[in-house]
């Protein structure tokens, strides 16, 4: 069954964080198939107008990141979509009833869900479809795959994370995810 892996780049660690970008990919967890991708930059000014927050420690952390990641974050603001536009586009990208994966259910999922709440629209997933890569990685601490793309680029991270799920589930065929 087709699933979604998403990643966000945000400017705070709280669930109320302003979102700078959303990246996602459709994938089959039990095969090597990687499908359509989604990547949108979100207007930070518009996020602020919707009450989303910025954290000094996160902004300082971004200052210390790789030049490519920082420039992508900065340049993305030049053509960034309003928050509601980005979320409506992400909702349209998500297949109905699909499992939705992220690296950790304590960061990406609540931040994205809160952004939907802030603009008054429902998330395109149900709570029972939420999946967490961090749990799988914890069960398979020695498995590694080659990384491609830029760290902290939402789309590159989503693709890498989808490949990690595929690799872990293929290596552990007895897991039912």
List each language-model region with its residue ranges.
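Anionic group-transfer/hydrolysis microenvironments
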Residues: 9-11, 25, 104-105, 110, ...
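Acidic, Mg2+-coordinating catalytic module of metal-dependent nucleases/exonucleases
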Residues: 99-106, 110-111, 143-177
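Short, function-defining helix-loop hinge/capping sites that tune catalysis or transport
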Residues: 15-17, 140, 165
């Amino acid at each position: 069954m087709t699933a979604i892996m998403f990643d966000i780049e945000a400017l705070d660690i709280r669930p109320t964080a302003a979102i700078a970008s959303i990246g996602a990919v459709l994938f089959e967890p039990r095969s090597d198939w990687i499908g359509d991708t989604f990547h949108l930059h979100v207007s930070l000014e518009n996020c602020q107008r919707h009450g989303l927050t910025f954290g000094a420690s996160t902004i300082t952390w971004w200052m210390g990141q790789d030049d490519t990641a920082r420039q992508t974050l900065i340049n993305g603001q030049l053509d960034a979509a309003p928050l509601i536009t980005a979320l409506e586009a992400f909702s349209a990208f998500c297949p109905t009833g699909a499992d939705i994966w992220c690296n950790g259910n304590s960061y990406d999922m609540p931040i994205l869900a809160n952004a939907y709440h802030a603009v008054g629209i429902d998330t395109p997933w149900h709570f029972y479809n939420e999946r967490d890569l961090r749990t799988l990685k914890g069960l398979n601490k020695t498995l590694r795959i080659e990384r491609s793309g830029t760290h902290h680029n939402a789309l590159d991270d989503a693709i890498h994370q989808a490949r990690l799920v595929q690799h872990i589930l293929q290596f552990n065929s007895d897991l039912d995810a």
